[in-house]
UniProtKB/Swiss-Prot annotation:
It comes from Stutzerimonas stutzeri (strain A1501). PANTHER family: HOMOSERINE O-ACETYLTRANSFERASE. Its main location: cytoplasm. Pathway: Amino-acid biosynthesis; L-methionine biosynthesis via de novo pathway; O-succinyl-L-homoserine from L-homoserine: step 1/1. Keywords: Acyltransferase, Amino-acid biosynthesis, Cytoplasm, Methionine biosynthesis, Transferase. Transfers a succinyl group from succinyl-CoA to L-homoserine, forming succinyl-L-homoserine. The active site is at residues 157, 323, 356. It is an enzyme of class 2 (transferase). Pfam families: Abhydrolase_1. It is found in: Cytoplasm. This is Homoserine O-succinyltransferase.
Amino acid sequence: MPTAIPADSVGLVSPQVAHFAEPLTLACGRTLADYQLIYETYGELNAARSNAVLICHALSGHHHAAGYHSEDDRKPGWWDSCIGPGKAIDTDRFFVVSLNNLGGCNGSTGPSSTNPATGKPYGADFPVVTVEDWVHSQARLADRLGINQWAAVVGGSLGGMQALQWAISYPERVRHCLAIASAPKLSAQNIAFNEVARQAILSDPEFHGGHFQEMGVIPKRGLMLARMVGHITYLSDDAMGTKFGRGLKSEKLNYDFNSVEFQVESYLRYQGEEFSGRFDANTYLLMTKALDYFDPAAANDDDLARTFEVAQADFCVMSFTTDWRFSPERSREIVDALLAARKNVCYLEIDAPQGHDAFLIPNPRYLQAFRGYMNRIAV
């Protein structure tokens, strides 16, 4: 609970829900007859409607990117360090929109929603969704809000992929595209990590083929293991060494397999336990599959430069030196393709010890660079 909401916070915010009755045909060939998207806004839309910024979330993200839902909240939104008055995404200048994507588990239509055809939760029957599907649904939300063009579309990790897809799918609707700690497609290693996480969930006896809600259970063990695998990839070796080293939780070895002996074990189990209590297993499967499928250059014979030729936006690409999940080399692939396509691009490689999670952490150099780019965007 904050003793007082900070002056540079957007303050108390309330989610809003947009309902869509127009069917949305997905890349998998299936159609959502109707659906809803939950979102939050921060700042004010100007008279020209030229100052809107879209925030795209990563795998476990959601619509609550900044501020507090109540004065009793212990923590603000997941990107509060970057969104607010005077911050990198300055809400005194910008009207910021953040939503929970289709297939999510925080209020937008997803596997835990009721399937109108059966009256039961969708569960495993919810269709596989892609980054392109998300961008098309986000475009409909923009239409609903009266936003013809985004001043910027911004995202980190999977969110950065959505920002890139926006610049490709709706080039006339994006003035600036910011892709942070992202990649033009997943490497084989990243797909492998996702598959291990999925198998942890699928092999949990409580998964019940994805219809665990009807059984009144959750695949807690599988979700815990999936999250533990994920967290290993989000942190750098240096960050884990500095934070935990080989420190013991109780100053002694127990010579068994059931005790939590090392501090890093305790950390991973805590993260897995916390995550399994708030996230939906089917959503986790969907998000990782959307990551695996993202490959915009596939439609152009794997020519990323040709893929970006349609873009009209200016680009800012940021990476972090110790990120081995989406390494700086992957960001430079994006930059090289943009340059080959003769696009305006700013590239920032930021020295940060935290690994992939660095895009969520208020590193002064990162925030300064982020703010510097956003400040040059005319509204």
